[in-house]
A protein has these predicted regions:
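Hydrophobic/basic alpha-helical segments
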Residues: 1-133
Length: 133
């Protein structure tokens, strides 16, 4: 029964794969992302063994690619933190208060730190402040 296996995959495997993804997702190398996608590809092959194409299996099971799911999860997490002034991590997000026009207000909503290294730029808050600007 593919519905039961799909539910098992989402509840057990996907939840383990995506655990604490805001802490590590943006620091993954392309090789690591490929490995995660390979895990999902194998799982969908178990759920739908007679389907040849990975994209068709994802469509049939209503699953996004794992990297898309993780990126969406991180984006939603950042938005939830940024929109809630009472969130304990909200103070880590720097809002740009020196906005001069409506156009610049949209472009420069967040003020990311000046980072010297790519690793620092790809941390959760720095990456998504740049992403949403």
């Amino acid at each position: 029964d593919s519905d039961g296996l799909r539910t098992f995959y989402i509840a057990n495997i996907k939840s383990i794969i995506s655990y604490a993804c805001p802490a590590w997702y943006n620091l993954l190398s392309d090789t690591d992302k490929t490995r995660l996608e390979r895990i999902q590809r194998s799982a969908t092959r178990i759920v739908l063994p007679f389907s040849d194409n990975y994209e068709q299996r994802l469509d049939h099971l209503a699953l996004p690619p794992i990297t898309t799911f993780l990126h969406t999860t991180c984006s939603e997490n950042f938005t939830r933190i940024a929109d809630n002034d009472n969130h304990p991590l909200n103070s880590r997000i720097k809002i740009n208060t020196n906005r001069t026009s409506a156009r610049r207000a949209k472009i420069d909503k967040y003020r990311p730190s000046k980072c010297r290294t790519t690793k620092r730029q790809n941390t959760f808050f720095e990456f998504y402040m740049r992403f949403f600007n």
